[in-house]
Amino acid sequence: MFSPLSRIRGIVADTVAMVVYCFLTGMAIEIVLSDMSFQQSLSSRLLSIPVNIVIAWPYGLYRDRIVALALRLNADSRWGKNIADLFAYVSFQSPVYVAILLTIGAEPSQILKAVASNAVISMVMGVAYGYFLEYCRRLFRVSVSPRPQIVSH
């Protein structure tokens, strides 16, 4: 169904999208909303790069399945997809984010602020990331179905 080259392009597209998006949005949240220093945020973002490389493809698969399920249950594909993107992003990223912040030595209050802020902002970010991910997939010529099927890359 998918050629090996198509799978590789899909993995690379998902990885580029995850690394770029999480670096930029994470740094903004950590500095502006969570009272982290630039150094703490930079440490967090640099640590997040290898983590995001590892989780990007599994997240892409997870997100595609959540979106496909939501679209199957909801005839209004735009709202269903947006809600699915929000749910997938928050439910997958929050535990990973806590682990990163613990690793860099953030204070519990900073972690709580950062994760809570991220969850609230994810009401927009998760949806925006879904569109950014699909944009990256198009850049890498990965087929993007308007109604994703439950398949693995």
From Swiss-Prot:
It is found in: Cell inner membrane. Keywords: Amino-acid transport, Cell inner membrane, Cell membrane, Membrane, Transmembrane, Transmembrane helix, Transport. It comes from the Bacteria. The chain crosses the membrane at residues 11-31, 42-62, 86-106, 114-134. It is a multi-pass membrane protein. InterPro entries: Ala_export_AlaE. GO terms for molecular function: L-amino acid efflux transmembrane transporter activity. GO terms for cellular component: plasma membrane. One of its GO terms (biological process) is amino acid export across plasma membrane. Belongs to the AlaE exporter family. Exports L-alanine. This is L-alanine exporter AlaE. The gene is alaE.
